[in-house]
Every structure is written in C-alpha cells, then in structure tokens.
C-alpha cells in the first residue's frame, strides 16, 4: 500500500460496539484491510481521520469539531438513547462485513456506520439523498472523534467522492450526536436537541429558525418516536439513505434567517460565562429578591434555568429550576436604579423577559424592557460567592465584549439508563465501589473482583431527577451519605431506604468515560476515593465538597454496564494466543485431565459454550463426552490447579466468565475466584500435550482466541492468494501442476475460486484458469497438487480446506481438512507444501479480491 507519514488519530474511540472499541487500533486496521481491492493495493491504504485535520473550508480543527451529518429513518428515542449501532455487531464478522470498499460502494450490511462531511465554500452544503423528501427522515448532526476518511483512503478510486464519507467501525456513541432535524416529506417539523451530547467547546450554534420548534429530548419522549413505515421493512432499510449512489450535494439554506428571535429550545439550561470558564448564573439564595451572580459549577439546582418562549412578546422568560416561582429579573424600578440581577416572583413586567441574540458561537441576553441592557459578567466579587453579574449597555471593545457572551448548555439528569453497573475509579486503576456487608455497613473502594459486592443497580427517579443506587450484595440497601450523623461524617454507607435526599445521586458526564457522582442533599458534595486504607482491606470512600479542591480525592468514575454474555452459545475451538496452534483438548484420558494439544480439528477439541442467565457465566461442555464439563476441582485436598472434565456438580468452579483483551482474545476466569484464569504452561503432560492450569499469576499463556465452528470466513469469490510478507508474491501453479510462489504478473493461473461446502464446513479451491482443477492435499511435507477434483471421488477430504482468520496478524491460515494438523506454507525455494501448522509467516496469506 501507499507509504505515508504516521499521524495521530482517535481511531475507534467513538464506537458504540464495545468489542470494537476495546481493540487496539492496529488490530482493527488489519481487520479492515484484509478485503482491500487488488487493483488499489499500490495506490491506496486505510486512512483514519486525524485528530487535527483541515476541514472543507480549509480551517484547521480538531476532529471533534468537524461537523458531520447522517441521514437516518430511526427517531431520536432510539438514536439519542443507543447511538448509531451498525447492522453487524457480532464478534468475528465475516470478510464482507468488514469490507470498507464494498461498504462505501454498495452500503451492504457491515460493522460500519456512514456519515458525510459538511462541505463549506462561503455557503454550507450537505450531501443529501434524493429520497430525503419522502416520508419521515432525520438529519443527525455529529461531532465525533476518529473514523475512517473514505476519500482519503481510496483517493481517485473512492466510489462516491462527492459524499465526502467518514465511516465509523462499530458505530457512534450517543454522546457524540448533538442534534437532529425531523423532516416529514421534506419539511422540517422540529429540531431535536440531545442533552447527553458531550460538547468539545468552540462549536457554532445549532442552526435554527423561528418557525421551527426546538425540543430538548428526554427518554421515551412522546414525540420522539415518529417513524416512517418503510423503515420497518427490514433490518437494513434504515441505512438506505446513506447509499452514495442515490444522492447529491445541495446547499443547506435552513436557518438563513437574520436576527432569529427564537434561537434556542424551550427547556432546562445552564448559562455559562464565556469570560469566566466554568462559571454559571447562580441563584444561591432561594428567596424572593435573591441576588443572581456568576459562580463556579456546583451541579446544583440553583444553577439550572428553565427557558420558555412567549410568542406574543417574542422573548424568553427564564425560571429558576430550584424554585419555579422565581424568574431571572432586572429590577429596573428599584429606587437605587440597581443594575444587578435578582430572582423575583412573576410580576408580568417586561424586565422579566429576555431576547436572546446569537453572537457567532455564543449568545447575548437583552432585557425586553430596554434592549440596550445586556447581561454582563463582572470581575467584582459577589457577597454571595463568585462574581457579580449586572445589566449594562453593549460593549464594543473587542477585548472585553466577551463579558456579555454566554453559552447555553442543555441540562440532562439521566445520562445512563437503569441497570446494573460497576463503578470504577478513573485515577486509581482497577479500584471500584464495593460493599462487603461488614458490620458498620461501610462502603469502600476495593480491587475489582467481579462479584455481587461490586454490583450496583441504578434506578432513576423522575421526581427528584436523580438516581438511587442499590447494592447488588443486599438488594434492600442503598448507597447513602449519612449527612444527618452527629459527627457530620463524610463516609458512605449502605442503608435501607429512608426517602431522604442523601440517598439520591446525580450523575454528571465529564468525558467519554468519566462521570461525577453528586449527592442530592448537597450537590457540592461529590463521591470520591482516597488512598487511605480501611480496616476491611480497601480504600476510603467518602463525599467531599467539590469546591474545596482536594487534590487527594479521586472523584472521576467510569460507570460500566455489566454484561457477561460476550459470545453466543455454540461450539468453539479454544486456541492459545501465545501458542496459536495449541487448543484446549480432552482426550478422555485417565483422571479426566484437560490439557493443551496441537490442533487436530476433532471432537476432543470442540467445546460447547452454554450461558447461564442466573449465574451470569458460561458452562463449557466437552465435544467428545456431552455429560462432562470443563472444571477446576478447587475442592481437592491437594488444592490442585489443573483442569479436569467432570460431570455436572452445580459448583461455581464449573462456571467461567470471559474477559476481553484488546486484541480480540479473551481471558477465561473461574466464577469461584475472579483471579483464577485458565493458562497454558510450557510443561509437557503424560498425554503428549502441554499442561493447563488455573492460576492467579500472570502467565504469558492466559489469553485465548475462540473460533466458532461452522462460520464462513470468506465468500464464494475469486481471489489472488498473496503471502503475508509480500502481497506482490502470490500462489500460482507450475507446468507440473505443483503450487508455487511467484511474483504477481497478473496471470490467470494465479486466480483461485473458493467454493464452500456447508456439509463439510470447508472449501474447494478451484483454478480459474482450467476447469475442474483444484487444490489436492498429498501428505505432510509434500507439494500441494493441482488436479481434477470434480470426478467420482469429489467428496475426498484431500480436496477440501478450512480457512482461519488470524486476528493478531490480519492474515489467513489454510488447513487440510484431511489432516487439520497440517497447513499450507511455502519453502525457501518457493514451493507450496503442507506442514505442521505453526502460524509462522510462511503459513499466512492475504486473500485479495478480484
């Protein structure tokens, strides 16, 4: 592929599919490159969108600030909740499902989600499908990291260059979707605002029109589920709008309305000063006439304001969220002619109404009584904390005019859905919130053990706009700050329900994997972890005032949903990561010992994974004796660490959980002890294999690749088969009908057609040059022969081959079905032979589509 300089990218950070987001960038790049078209190999390569890029208007921006668009038939109640989930989400997707060029050209079902860049050339242009004016359609606005730049990847060969496509493997999380336009037969009905959007800052405002309602979305919004009937026809129909062949670039004229009097939606906002970052309009005294000032973020109701638009006055009233009787007001009638702002009950005066004016990326708030008077941030300290805010005439000085500019931030109290979670500390690696049921009911931080002590069930209360967090260990106990204790203790305990506000928590998203957890009793109090040890072997968990700036309090949390069913039930081979030709094997030997053995593709090495919903773990059944299960005999008097195949006992030592690594492999952990993993040693067993143990040590052989039996890795198509080390060297045949490695000279004899036989779960590999001729296995260390495989003995296993994809290398291994221990490789003299499979470079190949 083309040789270009390395660059920084956010890659797959946006992915909503967890297994894709967890992969190393190198691994996912190999996965996407395996289907690269032959004709483009020398002139193109996979190009991720860089972290810093030159946008279509030639302005240098961060990738998170480049405006992308996606046309979709699915409504906000689905997209703002789940994000853009690709059609294909399963692990080990097949060849076509990871084919970037095929996806860009034909939009077939895949792991990708398509978007298009906003194109700017004095005016704004957007690629638009020709059927966007038919039925109910949504135009989603996206600011996401990473993704693959399709035009940059394929250059002049890009299938639809005017689409300016950015494709996202694994989809796009909801936090990167800012808004959506809802269109009915081409007419914009409303603009949806996503309150969970993670704003990178410095974005242009959402384009709006005074004639179009703006709506802040909430879960299960009654108007948020409008769906066109055609989107229900098939699983893939919602993606038809992004097919590059059915659209063109059109000018986006929506919102070209000077002095739009209604630039923001009605709803709940925080009003942030542009002059003083992280300072917000604040009504700290909840009384009639209470002074409004600018103060550092506290997460409290006193900094939340409810905007409502009056069509008659063409202005907004701004109501305090903490006290619905109080409104943002300028007491223009005061005898002192004061300029400060206060919270007053409704008077009907125009000094309680505000016109909101866009100033590029921000807003000014003008008082309706006197439109010359603008809300202005001051440097003067306020007696109530923070800084004073007044109304003042317009400032023209370019250096100080930002004191009259404000950012409106939609506020949402429900960033996560109800369910079970682990609460990981971001700063202190592998530490989670833990309740071990000790006598003092103390909740603390502890090393992650994947047990019910560390499971927390979040339930949202719409009255309090906050969460109750229930213990997984004891379902009647809630995470509680005992704020009423005489000692004014700051620790956190697990108490039965009291209906006190100190048992409610607000979850505030601060990053893609980062949250603050605030107590509703006092929103300045945040949950944090210190390095101080507790008597129970963990770390001290407490609440402290956010404004105190405690450097020793680690208060950022990654709240991870708990999901244990990583793979579908079915039959698998379990290959070792470090020794890729060794699989877990049970040969029914004395003592029921299970060991690692060179792969031979028989039932000894077949294992059936069966998920148990109650235990939330897998049982792993032998393929050779269906009444035996993969077991660690943890109860043996010798405390043995070996694995055995035993009949069902019901013990947790027969259950296993999968822990995904970042290269697509898994650690297999025993349910009885989270730290006990299946590991392969280099020690020989009496039965000809390698010893398997369960161990809490970090052996190098404790990660495994699961290959599902019966999956078809490649389609029935024609390919050149190139070596791993040099894609310009391919498998061809000699005049004596032996397979050889030659330079690719575009000969027909180096084109091979795959034909899959579903009964044998293997391929015939035919010559495209001579009818009926195909690959024939002769024996170990013999040439692979080209001969007639369509005769009376067509079913001979020597004519069939299995093909395995190697996630680590991005290449394929070709095994003989007749003798699966042997794989196709080549010698120094470039003869193609079969030998014991080792996954060495000379046994790995690229399949290049013709």
From Swiss-Prot:
Its EC number is 2.4.2.-. Changing residue 165 to Q: Complete loss of cytotoxic activity. It is an enzyme of class 2 (transferase). This is Pierisin. Within late stage larvae and pupal stages most protein is found in fat bodies. The N-terminus (residues 1-233) has the ADP-ribosylation catalytic domain. NAD(+)-binding or the presence of the linker do not alter the structure of the catalytic domain, however in vitro the presence of the linker masks the DNA- and NAD(+)-binding regions and thus prevents dsDNA-binding by the catalytic domain. Residues 1-233 are annotated as: ADP-ribosylation domain. It comes from Pieris rapae. Keywords: Apoptosis, DNA-binding, Glycosyltransferase, NAD, Nucleotidyltransferase, Repeat, Transferase. Changing residue 120 to S: Slight reduction in DNA-binding by catalytic domain.
